[in-house]
Amino acid sequence: MSVLFEPVTLGELKLANRIVMAPMTRSRALADAIPGSDMVEYYRQRAGAGLIIAEGTAPSACGLGYCRTPAIYSAEQIAGWQRVTEAVHAEGGRIVLQLMHVGRAASQHNKPAGAATVAPSALRANTQVFSDSHGLVDTDEPQALTAQGIQEVIEHYRQAALNARKAGFDGVELHCTSGYLPMQFMASGSNRRNDAYGGDAAGRVRFAKEVIEAMAGAIGAGRVGFRLCPGNPYNDIDDLEPAQTAAALCEAVAPLPLAYLHIMRSPLQGLDAFELARQHSPHALILNDSFDGPSANAALASGEGAAVSFGRHFIANPDLVERLRHGRALSRFDRKTLYTPGKAGYTDYPTWQAVAQEVAQ
């Protein structure tokens, strides 16, 4: 049998197979960053994955910055997510929540009134974000976090992990790449601090380390994972030593019995992120590298990691696990509907069986 379909345990997470649905922003949350019925159906359809990592979700109002993205700091948001987790669990699935604080990669047009845009240093990201009200806009000029502000953000993450468990999630993942707040602290280009949270790699990874420690202390380390992509330049990230930075974080959290490290292939030539992770992290690896079925199985069979994650393939193939199991053709997603409101391009992709039945008729 293909290794892909063997069960695996990651910390406290028992997976029926080694196929993980990667977290993907889809911009379908309702007003006030509340998950709605379309999100319930979307995740329910994909519950065949051994593990779903639900989309990046703000731990606080300050953590928001994109349009129609969810959060988990209010009672209404927790209730919305609870409907999602109940639907996934009813199908026999497992689901964790990716916590994503966008930091400076934000626009006030996408935030509640009074929610500040913060960063390790007062340096604006040279990029734009979309807003429903104003279209493409420049990112905000961020406020540099004070020492007290850093502790407040860490507490927001800790409480968000507790809220996630209250909502029924099996665990949480810290988003440490794509130019969001943890990565802004980690990268030398966006972190110009001269205190304990800046300077060398050990200082720059301290924020992410303390967030992971806080979440592990709140819900148990075996229910916490983190995601890395060394050298990812997205959202105007520049780091002079991406390999050393990633290694420093892996080593800093190595004493914690975390569930997993979700490691993405680096876009930088000569930087083998998977090998770096194996050398510097004791944690089980979820690999992400634009896999198809055969390449994913080969990676697992060779011992490169414990599981593999798929992103794009899960968009248009809600039954991806069964398609891979039986070698069936994969549908292609419509790029135009990736971030548009409503069911189109979200919950209306048919299963292979549904297509076959329609053809037969």
Cite the ranges covered by each PLM segment.
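Flavin-dependent oxidoreductase catalytic cores
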Residues: M1-Q361
